[in-house]
Amino acid sequence: MSARVLVADDSSTMRKIIIRSLQAVGVPEAVEASDGNEAVNLFQPGKFDMVLTDWNMPGKSGLEVIQSIRSQDPNVPIIMITTEAEKSRVLQAIQAGVSDYLVKPFTADTLREKLEKHGCG
């Protein structure tokens, strides 16, 4: 798998877990963003094959990250990875333009399924 993934999460521990999970499923390159503002600044259309973002981050929230990225690239897959599992939150993310939703904690196999579902596997 040669996908390039942008990983946005304010927890350095969570970013490491996500990146290890990506490596375990064959994603060789992940770029880290420690908050929503950094994620938006790093994103450029065509630079990433997928974006993984947390919901609650300083600066821009995951929803704001999704909206900003969607305004630049309506087709890049964006997966929200969060502890927010309530239906209303999932609906908010869908309305913002998220491609998929993954609740923490997750397994590498579940992440692989999401990547494959969105053409990054």
Language-model features: where?
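Conserved acidic segment of CheY-like receiver
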Residues: A3-T13, I18-L22, V51
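Short hydrophobic/Thr-rich beta-strand motif most characteristic of the beta2 strand and flanking loop
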Residues: V27-S34, L42
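Acidic catalytic/metal-coordinating carboxylates
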Residues: D35-E38, S61-E64
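Active-site beta3 strand of CheY-like receiver
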Residues: G46-L52
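Receiver (REC) domain active-site loop signature in two-component systems and cognate sites
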Residues: M57
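C-terminal output helix
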Residues: F106-L115
